[in-house]
């Protein structure tokens, strides 16, 4: 998801998105540790999406 799309969302929606991403990150880590994950770049994409959401949340809190 792009940062411009995230800026339009409310804080509650961003928190929900963050929880979903954290769950997805956990699942991907488990798949990677058991050798089931074929597309290892997904972990990096999810990690960066988490960073985007946290950045937008911080910006909204400061505003």
UniProtKB/Swiss-Prot annotation:
Gene3D superfamilies, per database record: 1.10.287.310
Keywords: Ribonucleoprotein, Ribosomal protein
Highest taxon of the lineage: Bacteria
SUPFAM superfamilies the UniProt entry points to: Ribosomal protein L29 (L29p)
Record's GO cellular component terms: cytosolic large ribosomal subunit
UniProt xrefs under InterPro entries: Ribosomal_protein_uL29, Ribosomal_uL29, Ribosomal_uL29_sf
Biological-process GO terms, alphabetical: translation
GO terms of molecular function: structural constituent of ribosome
Family membership: Belongs to the universal ribosomal protein uL29 family.
UniProt-recorded name of the protein: Large ribosomal subunit protein uL29
Lineage start: Bacteria, Pseudomonadati, Pseudomonadota, Gammaproteobacteria, Alteromonadales
Gene: rpmC
